[in-house]
Curated annotation (Swiss-Prot):
It catalyses: DNA(n) + a 2'-deoxyribonucleoside 5'-triphosphate = DNA(n+1) + diphosphate. This is DNA polymerase 1. It is an enzyme of class 2 (transferase). Keywords: DNA replication, DNA-binding, DNA-directed DNA polymerase, Nucleotidyltransferase, Transferase. It comes from Aeropyrum pernix (strain ATCC 700893 / DSM 11879 / JCM 9820 / NBRC 100138 / K1). Its EC number is 2.7.7.7. The keyword Transferase applies. SMART domains: POLBc. Residues 44-60 have a biased composition (Basic and acidic residues).
Amino acid sequence: MRVRGGQEAAQDKETSLDSDEERGRRGLRQTTLLDYMAGPAKPKKPEPPPTLHREREPESKYQNTLPETTGKEPASMSLRRNQPSSKHEEYNSESGDVRGLTLEPSPQSELSDDDVILELVREPWVESVRGYLLDVRYDGSLGKAVLMLYDPSSGSLVKWADRTGHKPYFLTDARPEDLRAAGVDVSHDESFLQYDLVEKFHPIDRKLVKLTKIVVSDPLAVRRLREKVSSAGFSVWEADIKYHHNYIFDRQLIPGILYEVGGVRIVHTLPLEMDDATRIVDEIFREEPREVRERAREWLRIFEAPPPKLPLIAFDIEVYSPIATRLPDPSTAPYPVISAATADSSGRSRVVLLYRDGVEFTEGALPEGTEVEIYDSERAMLLDLVRILQRYPLVVSFNGDNFDLPYIARRLEVLGVPREFAPIELKQDYATFRRSLHIDLHKLFGIRALQVYAFGNKYRELSLESISRALLGKGKVELKAPVSELNLNKLIEYNLQDARLTLELLTFSNNLVFNLIIMVMRTSKLGIEDITRSQISNWIRGLMYWEHRRRRWLIPSRGEIEKLSSAGARVGAIIKDKKYRGAIVLDPPVGIFFRVLVLDFASLYPSLIKQWNLSYETVNNPNCRDTIEVPEVGHRVCREFKGISNEIVGMLRDFRVRLYKKKSKDKSLREEERLWYDVVQSAMKVYINASYGVFGSEKFSLYSLPVAESVTALGRAVLRGTLEKSRELNLHIVYGDTDSLFIWDPPKDVLNDLVDYVERTYGLELELDKVFRAILFSGLKKNYLGITEEGDIVIKGMVAKKSNTPEFIKDEFSKAVKILSKLEKPEDVEAILAELRDHINTVYNNVKKKVYTLDQFAIKVMLSKNPREYDKNTPQHVKAAMLLQRLGLTLSRGDIVYYVKTRDKLGVKPVQLARLSDVDPGKYVEHVKTAFEQMLMAFGISWDDISGVRKLDRLLFDS
């Protein structure tokens, strides 16, 4: 452990928070170690937040966020005055003991702030390299696309500027003379470069078309000129594609694989020999046309290429805040960063701390293997932090886009680092580095398709705690005090745990999530910073556009595709916010069933897309003569040519089912290979299962209502036919949902007959998904609780898993689930019900007697906007926030409000102002009822049938 000296000038004696802006305007200056040793003058005190007089001990930890009115100012946030010491005791990493440690500056030579900044802004340009393509950016100062590649030989990220002469453009059906005649001669625009005549195949019209390509020097000019051209009555195409995406599509780049770049050459290197690829593809796709097999061989080589192994670093910062429930505003960065932790893929952990008077180490060990440095200069600390981060090709954060990076960037500006020297780049909707790439796991794990198909809905809340608990089995360090009040031991432990969790979420199970990202990049043809921040519709769009360019197809306009919807939907929508009818969901029974098998149609919708040749250009296309009608909805599907969606989805499905699912379980392969193949098949699963849905989303650029409607209609026909056959075979179907059947204790031979029927009739595979030894149905759709033969609990819709559920409800529901997990056989039901009844009665008694603490009753909600912006229908958490504002506390968007439900007219109080006596038990009855009522329905008893509940309700509401 060592103390790092700052770079403040000797005459700059003011070191309080209030002087940051003023010191920042003076620019960058160096000082000597002797200046640092002299120490700062007594600092000014920051303005204390509004105070509240308290005459009682706090009943909630959140009440500590309101300061006492003692007349004393809060502890200052000054830089440390370091005095020379004759004794220097190093941190003992073996014992972990920090007692008696003397903190003093290191006499070793240090980089000045200026030197660090020069290192941070130095660009890693190369003329040639052999490396993995991770991303493509547009550099406005160069007017060129820039490839971001990981160079394994140096272990660093390098940049290569395009030398192929690629420029922004868009297409129109207007000839140059037509534009001049219409008074929109774009050749006079300052960004105009040239007109080109190009020929493209129109996938809907089924013919070659000649178009004018308007080439410009600036991507922003595309938007400006396309409006002029279209307003003159001409059609435009491919004018809304981001330039760096256009570059990838035109150059047919595949992010995530190895390239050799130099001169004007950009050539990928794939390990699998073409002869081997031909043999495997011919076996799987023997019935497909030659051109499809050729494309499949290229796909196979991409899938077989092993993923890169990059040095990774995760980081997290902690910021001082005078109000514990407030997240400091990153746009102004008013308070200092007091701690920052990093954890890298080599196992190295670092924590940098800002020295603060009165904040010391206590007894106890620091986290094992941790390097700790203490700075008297926040600016030097932050510059060193970013310098460390940018040494890695890939930086990982959790919510770094919205908080950590914007805060650091703005804070450096406050501390005097000019914006043009800032190492962090703040984009419109994300943040990154000049010399590194950045992944924000908060956005990655918020991608719905990954949450459902890759991680099986294991997490519901998009918090580091929730996701880590679900995927890693561990979580954040629990705190009993606000971060700003922690001693250094606890601050280090808390901060470092967040960084380590962030890294582990990317690297657990042999780099599972990172490898999944690489596979999605290769499939979507998008860079790493794009795919980790966008929903799957953008992934599919990237793949579709890339394939259009490969085939020299024109990407049709939205209006052209919508014309094919003129046949209209024949079945009304029954799903909220959808324009087409969805899948069949059977009405479930009420009760408990033992030994229920769940059978799934393997990749039902992707299989139907392949079988029926469904694609935006094949459904209702007037230029096709040979068609077949989709039952129930009446759309006509072309059989003269293969649709692009049919080919892509079908190919991914066949690769997954017929090759990679098997390879992922092949014990003859090395474990590393099996794990990679499991990632490959998982990525394919994500793609193919979302493929039909995007065509039914109006936000999707290739939106096609007839395609989405045809897929679900065919799915309903398959499920109805299978149900009829099940009845013929005397199988007891207790429930069905979209592509799943819940069958009660079926004979094995009869079940095999059903599987054979589905394969013969529909060409689909009916697979065993899971076996429940017991399952509880409440009678509501998509609402059940099952215990598998392995003892795993599967809960569907039975409890609200929202972050604003009172903590005691979550705990008590988990205890109830543990009781239900004891169900083994019908004879257990009576005893389990009795135990469950006792548990619920205990919960009610605890609510009535207020056994739970104020914090357990608290409901936590984040403000989505400033309280003053609510003019009507004010939510409860906003009412609580307004009470705090009346005391002088400033609350804004992003602040977390903790409140309880009370007996008074307003009905709520912030926890800071509440006492247990204020809590209204009757209002919490509804929370308990919501959590347990559906569970009880499965036992065939009503809410009031439980002994004591009716009486207890009356007592609660009347007391």
